[in-house]
Regions:
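Electropositive polyanion-binding surfaces
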Residues: 38, 189, 194-196, 213, ...
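Charge-lined substrate channels and their catalytic hotspots, especially those that engage the 3′ end
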Residues: 2-292, 299-344, 376, 384, ...
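A short macromolecule-binding patch
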Residues: 102-107, 168-174, 663-680
């Protein structure tokens, strides 16, 4: 038998691996024995004969196709698909097709050095006996990330970046002249200037920004943003353009608008909010209530195609980290010019409703308006008033609350799904350090605002969506209706039947019955029943999490399919143009159609919708990472302390435990569970001791000790204290 360099004999497995790698590197080519032997340096007769035997076996397995007596090619399925490459730290990479379906395994040797999130083209390999379905990357269509964030290490002759996250497969080499003054131990942003190839697996980059010392709050928050390709600085040219915008409201502009300056109007927002997108007005008109949903008229100040607009389009959304907001618009616009600040005349785009006492819509119209907010409320203030405390304009607020409750009751009666999940919040000191960690619950005050925003969003979407189904309106304040107007919808598809089946299987051991087929209303009613029945039970978090996973993700599109979760046939985002670019798009389209304009190019707007949906998801990833960071930072000085907790999640690698007092969650790794060897019972969501049969189940009360708080990796590790 032949030998490798160094004298080690080639085994049949060695030969098979070498042949497999060669054909996967040339997926569309026919290779002759001569080419194969030369490429793999199979020089001896025994090795060549063994190689031919191996290829015949691969042919029997349908892994290779024989082209002639002495040539083969890789047996690829005829179809080629495009999609996203998902890189895993454990090497179990996968390909997610664009058109949905299950992820397909991609071995590292078949990845073409694709990185996490890259758009790729793959060919599916014929499945060998007893092997899982596999794909091979044949082309990298688009790199998701062209920059990395990490810790610099500067050596005598070279430097490299130890990249954070799972985006990159290896350290990034940096020429010394491309360091931009960076030093060992500093965090930096590096732009990739050379990607891996068949000739070289090295990734080479250049430093574009030195963030600063690892562990400093600003450095870490900027690092999270940069890791996801999100901006943490505003271009000076855009800031300068914002400074030049005239904030004065002329008499001529006021004359063109409906005047609500003398009607009671207020904003209700989080106590630390600065950008006030929306305001509500209310007054009695005859037997009915006139409620105005007034939205900052961003499109009046931000001209389509301007430098400010291009930057906003690229960002697509404001990003909300734990201790800061990275605004979509320059600060002068979002916090001052456009913001509906109290006691200041402001331009708004409004949906004016005429409602009866049960919140039924008797009439409505769309109008460009001028308002003057009488009061800026925090949610907490309004909640106290709704609970009976005296306060400014208490009667008006309580009337709005009553109307909102009617709207909410009707919405759930019509099939909306109740997802009132608690959100984790932090109190932060002046240095960015978390001083308190707690859950924030939905209240009547937050639901009041939510219901009127939903009403406005649904109403304008329904109006455009039903275009052509009614005669042209004679009301000049309503958009002209013509068939087929391109519009931006917020859509949410029905749950995938397979996901519902998975939910049914997972919850069956707990006694819950999941409906996997039926009408939309029947399924949503069943999902609401699940969450109601699980309230206060130890598996409550599991039920909520798995039910949420069964739902599809909401997104933006010009192709309307309705919004399943809200039970609306038509829905859009109209109410937050300061922080969401789709809302600005909607404002412009409504104004265009209101003025009798023709429909816009649908393909162009669909591309914008896809971009905004992607940026929304990216922003959510960054927000979650900031929460993880602050959670670990909050617990860093508590290592060694014990806390009462409960099991909040069970996985094959350990137990997630949530501390009862502060809701911080950490992992008790399988290797830290003493006294037995524990196995994961996936069906019943528990760990079972092989010898003792002791079980760790969701909701079980436990006493934990904080073992490690790794801020750099954003990981919190616990051990059981008893």
């Amino acid at each position: 038998m032949g030998k490798k360099k160094g004298g080690k004999r080639l085994t049949k497995r060695d030969i098979a691996d070498a042949i497999q790698a060669l054909f996967q590197a040339h997926p569309g080519e026919t290779l002759s024995f001569k080419q194969i032997f030369k490429a793999l340096k199979f020089d001896t007769h025994p090795v060549k004969m063994l190689a031919i035997d191996v290829m015949e076996e691969m042919e029997w397995d349908d892994w290779l196709s024989r082209v002639s007596d002495n040539s083969y090619k890789l047996n690829l399925k005829t179809q080629v698909q495009e999609g996203t490459f998902i890189r895993k730290a454990n090497g179990k990479n996968s390909f997610q097709p664009d058109d949905g379906g299950k992820p397909v395994f991609v071995a590292e040797r078949n990845s073409m050095f694709a990185l996490n999130g890259d758009r790729v083209k793959v060919a599916f390999m014929a499945r060998r006996q007893n092997h899982i379905k596999e794909a091979i990357v044949t082309e990298i269509l688009e790199r998701k990330h062209d920059q990395a964030v990490g810790i610099l290490q500067v050596e005598k002759d070279f430097a490299f970046l130890n990249a954070e996250g799972n985006f990159f497969t290896s350290d990034i080499l940096i020429p010394k002249k491309k360091l931009k003054g960076g030093k060992t131990g500093e965090k930096a942003v590096v732009k990739i200037i050379q990607w891996p190839s068949a000739e070289s697996k090295k990734i080479i980059g250049e430093v574009v920004d030195v963030l600063g010392k690892q562990g400093e709050n600003n450095v870490e928050m900027h690092a999270i943003l940069a890791q996801y390709g999100l901006p943490y600085k505003y271009p000076k040219k855009v800031e300068d353009a914002a400074q030049k915008i005239n904030a004065e409201i002329s008499a001529e502009e006021i004359a063109r608008r409906e005047d609500f300056r003398d009607v009671f109007t207020c904003t209700i927002d989080p106590k630390d909010a600065k950008d006030f997108d929306d305001a509500l007005s209310i007054r009695k008109v005859g037997k009915h209530w006139e409620v105005g949903v007034h939205i900052a008229d961003v499109s009046h100040y931000v001209t389509e195609g301007s430098i400010i607009d291009r930057e906003a389009e690229q960002r697509a959304t404001s990003v909300y980290l734990v201790d800061r907001t990275i605004p979509m618009l320059p600060e002068r616009l979002c916090n001052f010019v456009c913001s509906l600040r109290p006691n200041e005349e402001k331009l708004s785009y409004s949906v004016i409703f005429e409602l009866d006492d049960d919140a039924n819509i008797k009439d409505w119209h769309l109008a460009h308006t001028v308002i003057k907010s009488d009061r800026r409320y925090a949610y907490e203030e309004v909640q106290e008033i709704l609970e009976g405390k005296d306060g400014d304009y208490a009667d008006e607020l309580r009337t709005l609350d009553t109307l909102a409750k009617h709207l909410r009751e009707r919405r759930f009666k019509n099939g909306a799904v109740k997802f009132d999940r608690e959100e984790l919040h932090f109190d932060i000191d002046d240095n960015g350090k978390p001083t308190r960690c707690y859950f924030k619950k939905s209240t009547d005050a937050t639901q009041l605002i939510e219901e009127f925003m939903l009403l406005a969003n649904r109403t304008v979407a329904e109006f455009i969506g039903k275009a052509g189904k009614a005669k042209k309106s004679e009301d000049p304040n309503k958009p002209s209706k013509s068939k087929g107007k391109t519009f931006v919808y917020r859509i949410h598809d029905q749950p995938d039947p397979q996901k519902l089946e998975n939910l049914r299987t997972a919850l069956a051991p707990f006694g819950y019955k999941v409906k996997t087929s039926g009408t939309k209303g029947a399924i949503s009613k069943n999902l609401n029943k699940l969450m109601e029945e699980s309230q206060g039970e130890r598996e409550q978090k599991l039920v909520e999490t798995l039910t949420l996973r069964a739902m599809m993700k909401a997104k933006y599109s010009t192709h309307n399919i309705g919004h399943y979760g809200l039970a609306f046939d038509y829905y859009t985002h109209f109410t937050s143009p300061i922080r969401r670019y789709p809302d600005t798009m909607v404002h412009r389209l409504l104004t265009r159609y209101q003025d009798g304009g023709r429909s816009v190019n649908q393909d162009h707007y669909e591309e914008l919708c896809e971009h905004c949906s992607q940026m929304e998801q990216t922003a959510q990833y960054a927000e979650r990472d900031s929460i993880k960071y602050k959670m670990v930072e909050f617990m860093a000085d508590k290592v060694g302390l014990e806390f009462d907790a409960h099991i909040s999640g069970v996985q094959s690698y350990g137990l997630y435990c949530e501390i009862d007092d502060n809701h911080c969650e950490g992992l008790v790794g399988m290797h830290d569970l003493d006294g037995d060897y524990y196995e994961f019972d996936e069906r019943n969501y528990c760990l079972v001791g092989r010898r003792t049969h002791h079980k760790y189940q969701l909701g079980d009360a436990v006493r934990i000790k904080v073992a490690r708080a790794n801020i750099e990796k954003r990981q919190l590790d616990f051990i059981l204290a008893d």
